Amino acid sequence: MQNRYGKLASWVYNLDKPVGRSFGDQAYYRQRLEHCDAGPILEPAVGNGRILIPLLEAGYAVEGFDASEEMLDYCRAACRARNLSASLTRQTFAEFSYDKRFTAIILPVGSFQLVTDVASANAVLRRFYDHLAPNGRLIVDLDPIGGFLGRSGSIRSWMTDDGDLLTLTDHRVETDYVAQTTLSHLRYEHWQGGNLVATELDLFKLRWWGVNEFSLALRAAGFEDVVVSGNYQHGRAPQKDDEIITFEARRPANEGI
């Protein structure tokens, strides 16, 4: 199944990107949320709670959803370990629904790029818009094209606390320059005492966006005041060597819920 975080994929993600690990995004998102109205915050594709949990600990009212029950299990366990309460549900980008409106919706580290069909992506942006309160903000990280076209065939490994070995082999099998997508085969392996005990093969597809292209998509969805920033320096225009590009946009205050 494409873009599904199963048992081994979620395990590897939790080892590689544990709760609290920051790539510069945690401080940035906290700083940007200080400029938002008080109220509930939504993190789609919440994963293991790497961003959500530090925000909860800082006093923000954050809730999240994810398409992977395995990832949500890690997030729930991390919340329990810290005596935190969070609303976490299994939902998808295409169908998520809440009976409330949020003052901010945040998507760190390129999660939005899991939506690879342009029409679907535009519909998701409109869905975000509809779930924001007037004056609410959408903050989205996108990886630039350079992050998609690097070397393929990498092999990475992680040791668990019990001494097991997890490996990930990443092999890109297609780059579509018209659709602006890459497709990779990800092979996860779980080893115990030199014996292979489990294997998981996933198809992983991502889409890159041009800066102006995504800005136009935000405006087409109804957003205003689009600010594009490079490398978590708010208001600094992206540069060619930046590793992350952040878009912040606002639902107009004069519209009703």
State each model region's role.
Residues 205-257:
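C-terminal lobe and adjacent flexible extensions of AdoMet/dcAdoMet transferase-like proteins
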Residues 122-134:
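A short glycine-rich, Lys/Arg-flanked "PGG" loop and its adjoining helix->strand segment in the class I
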Residues 52-95:
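Class I SAM-dependent methyltransferase SAM/SAH-binding core
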Residues 45-48:
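Class I SAM-dependent methyltransferase "Motif I" SAM/SAH-binding loop
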Residues 139-213:
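SAM-dependent methyltransferase
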